[in-house]
């Protein structure tokens, strides 16, 4: 993901947690905060240490980033998202991760995601 599509700072994460709305399925929780003045969407990823060792956590983050890269044209701009991975995603394949992210994005009200 390009730098303009990332959330890195703790206060930006906290703003999305406190002011945003959340949607979830069994694998992911997605917090969403509207930022109309922002030209792009931004994504922050969080994978807890409860999920596995560093290898497993980094694998999950790589799969989520790749799915976001493939879906970037369909994700609404002007929004911040924080994606939190849950334990079941540790055993998922890339296709399952992508399908699960599409499902949770649709639940959050995104109309443009069609896959």
UniProtKB/Swiss-Prot annotation:
List all membrane-crossing ranges: none
**Alphabetical UniProt keywords:** Endonuclease, Hydrolase, Nuclease, RNA-binding, tRNA processing
Highest taxon, organism lineage: Bacteria
Residues of the signal peptide: none
EC numbers: 3.1.26.5
- Show the GO MF annotations: 3'-tRNA processing endoribonuclease activity; ribonuclease P activity; tRNA binding
Tell me the Gene Ontology biological-process terms attached to this UniProt entry: tRNA 5'-leader removal
This protein's GO cellular component annotations are: ribonuclease P complex
- The answer to whether UniProt assigns keyword RNA-binding to this entry is yes
PROSITE patterns assigned to the protein according to its UniProt record, in alphabetical order: RIBONUCLEASE_P
Top EC class for this record:
hydrolase
Member of which family? Answer: Belongs to the RnpA family.
> What does the UniProt function comment say about this protein?
RNaseP catalyzes the removal of the 5'-leader sequence from pre-tRNA to produce the mature 5'-terminus. It can also cleave other RNA substrates such as 4.5S RNA. The protein component plays an auxiliary but essential role in vivo by binding to the 5'-leader sequence and broadening the substrate specificity of the ribozyme.
HAMAP family xrefs? RNase_P
Q: How does it assemble?
A: Consists of a catalytic RNA component (M1 or rnpB) and a protein subunit.
Quote the protein name from its UniProt record. Ribonuclease P protein component
What gene does the UniProt entry assign to this protein? rnpA
